[in-house]
Structures are given as C-alpha cells and as structure tokens.
Amino acid sequence: MNQNFSSMIDRYKHQQLRIGSVSPQQISAWTNKILPNGEIVGEVTKPYTFHYKTNKPEKDGLFCERIFGPIKSGICACGNYRVIGDEKEEPKFCEQCGVEFVDSRIRRYQMGYIKLACPVTHVWYLKRLPSYIANLLDKPLKQLEGLVYCDFSFARPIAKKPTFLRLRGSFEYEIQSWKYSIPLFFTTQGFDTFRNREISTGAGAIRELLADLDLRIILDYSSLEWKELGEEGPTGNEWEDRKVGRRKDFLVRRVELAKHFIRTNIEPEWMVLCLLPVLPPELRPIIQIDGGKLMSSDINELYRRVIYRNNTLTDLLTTSRSTPGELVMCQEKLVQEAVDTLLDNGIRGQPMRDGHNKVYKSFSDVIEGKEGRFRETMLGKRVDYSGRSVIVVGPSLSLHRCGLPREIAIELFQTFVIRGLIRQHLASNIGVAKSKIREKEPIVWGILQEVMRGHPILLNRAPTLHRLGIQAFQPILVEGRAICLHPLVRKGFNADFDGDQMAVHVPLSLEAQAEARLLMFSHMNLLSPAIGDPISVPTQDMLMGLYVLTSGNRRGICANRYNPFNCRNFQNEKIDANANKDKYIKEPFFCNSYDAIGAYRQKRINLESPLWLRWQLDQGLIASREAPIEGHFGSLGTYHEIYGHYLIVRSIKKKILSIYIRTTVGHIYLYREIEEAIQGFCQACSDGT
C-alpha cells in the first residue's frame, strides 16, 4: 500500500478492501517512488538489514531508508534534520544519502520489491485446493508441479518454425533421458538459445500457457462440453458415471473461475510473479530486547533467503558464461522454493525451521487463523456497547427473548438510562445520574426496564460461520451473571450450555435497530438458510424432558394397568385381583386441569401419578362396540364404566353424567403449552388479516 492508496482510503472513507491478484505494473506503481533528483528507488537488492557497527539500515537492504522512508521523522541517514511541511525552497531530501525528509509513519505502508531473475508461480494459486492454475489450464496438478519445479520440460507449442523436438516426434512432455541430457551439452548462452526455441520449463512455461488463454473461449468450450455430458445420460457403469460426474463438477468450477477473472479484469498470467513485493518494515520489525539482543520477524529471514538465491541466479545468468544449464534450472527451482516458503511455509512438505527447530512463520501463518492479522487485529478488537458472558438455558423464556444480567445491562444501556433520568427530572446533570446508577437506586432499574423494552440486542457466538451465528433478541433483566437463552435457538448458534460464551452488542442507529427487528429476530429465523430444513427443533434434554413428562409410570410407557395388550399386567391382575380391585377408586379425580396442577404444586401427587380428569369429550368419539374393562357401582347410585383411557359416570337410568380421562400432570402441562401456542398462532393470524 503506497501513500496515494492510503490517502485515497482516508479521503473517501472506504470501509472495505479487496484481496486479489495484481499486475506487475501495479506492483511497480505501488513500490517505486521518484526522488526529487529524478532517481527511481524501490528495488531491494541486498539481503542485509542493519549494519552491525553503526546499527543503521543497510542501503538497498530490507530496511533501507531510501526505499521505505526515515526511521525518525525529518531525520535522514546522515543525521541531518528538516522541519516536515516547511515550505521553504530547500531540498526535500538529503543529497548525500538520498533519504526524504518525511514522516516516519511512511514506513508502515511504503513497500519495496524484489525483481526476480526468473518467473515464479504463486503457490496459493498452484497448490491450494482447488488449484486455480490447474483448473484454467485443464491439466493435472501433478504434471504442473513437475513443470514448475523443473522436473521435466515442455515442448514449446507456440514456435512458428519446426523445432528439433517436434521433428523428433516429441509431443508434450519429454522423456527422462532428455531431461538430463539436454542441459549438460550447452553453456548458459547456448542453453538459453536452445530453450527459447525448443523447450520451456519452470514457471515461465506456466506463464506462457496462461498468457495464451482466451477466457471467452474457455467459457464457450466448457459450457458446450458440460451440455454434451449432460445429454449422454447414465451409462450403467458406476465407474464411468462417477468419472463423468467429476468432470462435470470440474467444468462448473472452471466456468465460474473464468467468469470471475473476466468480471474483475484480472489476467491469468498475473498468478505468476515477476516482481515480488516487500512488506513495509514496520509490519516485519526488528526490535531490541533486554541485554542488547535483537528479535526479528520470521518474514525478514524468509526475504533474505529469497534475495540470496535470486542474486545467485542473476550472477549465473549474467556473469558466469560457462555454467551448465542444469545448474541454472536447479537454481531457478531454489528460487521458486524460497518464494513458496515465504508465502506459505510447509505447503510442499516439511516446513523450514530455524536453528532452534522452530518453524518460520510465513505470510499465510501471519494472516490466517484465530491469531492471524484479520481475525485478531482487524476483526477481533473490542468495540463499544458490547459485553460477553457465559450462556445458560432459560426454559421459561419466549423464543425471541433472552435474559441479560443486571451488571451487563446497566453498563450497555447506561447512556440511555442517564438520558431517561435527566428527562424525567430525576437527575439534574450527568454526574448526578451516574451517582444514582453507581448506588443502584430502585428508580434506575425501572428506567432500565423501560429502555430495554423498546431496544433489541444482538447475540453473537464465535465463530460466525453463517448468518444464524448472530441473532437479535428482546432482552429482559435476570439475576446472576450468565446470559439466559432459549434452548431452541441453540442449534443456530451451534452452542452448548457447557460453558460456551456469547457476545452482546447494542444496535445504536435506527437503521441497525430496524434491521434487527425485521431480519434478525430469532423467531423469524426458524429455517436453515442452507437447506431450508427447520433449525429450531427440540433436541437432547428437551426430548428427554418430553419423554419423562409424558411417559406416565416410571416402569415404562407400556406399564398401564388398563392396557389390555400388556400381558404382564394382565397376569398380575389375575393373581392380585382382590388387592387391586378398588385401585382406580384410590386414583384422584379432578374437575379441571387447574385443580390437578395445584395438587401437584402442593406435592399431593407426583408428575407421573395417574389421575382422572373431567373432560368435555364428544360422545360421538366413544366407540359403541367398545366394551368396558371394569364396572363399579357408587354409593350414590352412580355407575362407573372403566374403558382403556377414559371413564364414564352414568346415572341409574344409564344417562351419562360426566366423562373422565385417565392422564398425568405431565400430559396436562404439555397439552396446555400446545393449546397456548395454537391460540397465539391463531390470534397472530387474525391480527395479520
């Protein structure tokens, strides 16, 4: 990022950056700068950092002040000082050392570059899956790797004249004997002439192939091939069908990749580097610790490795005229491996380690992962109006509500509470209002509840992998220090109530509050955005709770005395007929569900205890052919007919006086919850119409 780019961000207040491939011209524009005397600087040619005697940056090194700017504002490498921003007609740079008199903060964004002696493929586009280079070229990744790392050569298909290798009948890739025999019989100049005409190897071959691609033709041919494969239909051979399916998936990825390159105006050959950018020094610092020892970023050592190997290759190509071509190819391979290690250490096998057997941190290690530049430094910062706490289950909450601890709520909504105290003339100024909040006066909690009633909050659980990872809730005050959450929203957050933590955010602007209410409320996100299946479904403890609530007798769900299909109970009835003769009489009778629940709360009956509940049952539902299991006469002349799941009380004249169903308190609780839910749904539908 150069100064113009940085100022552009500040001027237009851009809130986003795009990471992608750039052209060599763009890299040169970012890194090169023209001094007032007309000299162009920016290329890093030496692998040195600081001079061991003067402790000053080496010229044209990784910390050069001519390239990256002065270490101290307005002070050049010679020690001269100029006032920054002085409009006198004085030179803006030191004529002796060539350092500009500018602010030292320029070292945070001024980049340099390394001019590579040979093209180098970007390992992210070659080795990361899916391989973009392999997809565009429609070639196996293994063969491309062998070509990049000079394991074999490639007959140049773009030669206008008949080449020796083509006349020999070679097609695309050379046999192993040619790999070793060709370079040995040519000096550097002769080998270059031969290679430029006959063969191509290394990243240069990849660059030529990518430069010859026509993305529009790739789109047309890939789409046509996909249609032809789709029209063929299944062959009946499972192996062939799988092969066709994989080919169709590959064609889809290739089309999408080509469309992306066209849409973003990126040329495929930019995936092969000719100029390697050098990070600003402040992003890869060398610091001095106690005892005079220096600590350096691992990236500096990886840059030094690249420069050493690149300079060696440059010397082989320019000065040593008798060097065998095989040595040149080996050195090109070493440069490629050094750049690979700089970008992604360990992607090709064993990572590079230092003298203490510690793996060097490459670019990928610096920016990716939880401790990377993006998640820790840019996205992981603490923000205002936010909090964090452990989540616990709140079964009594509504789906769109969450319990917010008082300590967190008073901190998050403190400004709103202060405004409420002043508006209601309960505090004369902000200081008095804060004093009332610190003393936790009762009026504060009342105003806090009033503020929270109309203000949603956002709950977020990291990592936020999809949109259900952050949802809106209506907060209510709860005791304790944990956030209470409805168990049905657990799956959307992928959370468990075993110590997971969640962050709380307060939307401040009206737009954010409207978005939270219209799009992000939990009761409006009941379906999975990926597959459309219900995501708020009972699981684990809820299913076990429903089982216990409705199972009845703890001996099992089939342990019903009046179940005629339970053979064990039928035998027990024969054995203990006298003992259980009046057992149903001992089971309590209730006129309504409120009396039954009241008896349970008074601990007169248990949750699974069977009872008789008076019920308005349609007589048409009673099967006329069903015979009663038992019958008993009451003391008042009534007659009780006991069926499988209900009881009919008749008068002497056989008239039905009342009907009771045999149930438990657990069934009553479940029925009431379902009834309330249905009534609420019907009321919402009627209000909507």
Swiss-Prot record:
Cofactor annotation remark: Binds 1 Mg(2+) ion per subunit. Binds 1 Zn(2+) ion per subunit.
Location of the protein in the cell: Plastid, Chloroplast
Keywords from the UniProt entry: Chloroplast, DNA-directed RNA polymerase, Magnesium, Metal-binding, Nucleotidyltransferase, Plastid, Transcription, Transferase, Zinc
GO BP term (any one): DNA-templated transcription
Top enzyme category: transferase
Binding site for Zn(2+): 76, 78, 94, 97
Function statement: DNA-dependent RNA polymerase catalyzes the transcription of DNA into RNA using the four ribonucleoside triphosphates as substrates.
Cofactor requirements of the protein: Mg(2+); Zn(2+)
Catalytically driven reaction(s): RNA(n) + a ribonucleoside 5'-triphosphate = RNA(n+1) + diphosphate
Family per record: Belongs to the RNA polymerase beta' chain family. RpoC1 subfamily.
EC number(s) reported in the record: 2.7.7.6
Name recorded for this polypeptide: DNA-directed RNA polymerase subunit beta'
Quaternary data: In plastids the minimal PEP RNA polymerase catalytic core is composed of four subunits: alpha, beta, beta', and beta''. When a (nuclear-encoded) sigma factor is associated with the core the holoenzyme is formed, which can initiate transcription.
Positions contributing to Mg(2+) binding: 496, 498, 500
Record GO cellular component, one term: mitochondrion
Species, as recorded: Populus trichocarpa
InterPro entries: DNA-dir_RpoC_beta_prime, RNA_pol_asu, RNA_pol_N, RNA_pol_Rpb1_1, RNA_pol_Rpb1_3_sf, RNA_pol_Rpb1_clamp_domain, RNApol_RpoC1
Single GO molecular function: zinc ion binding
PANTHER family: DNA-DIRECTED RNA POLYMERASE, DNA-DIRECTED RNA POLYMERASE SUBUNIT BETA
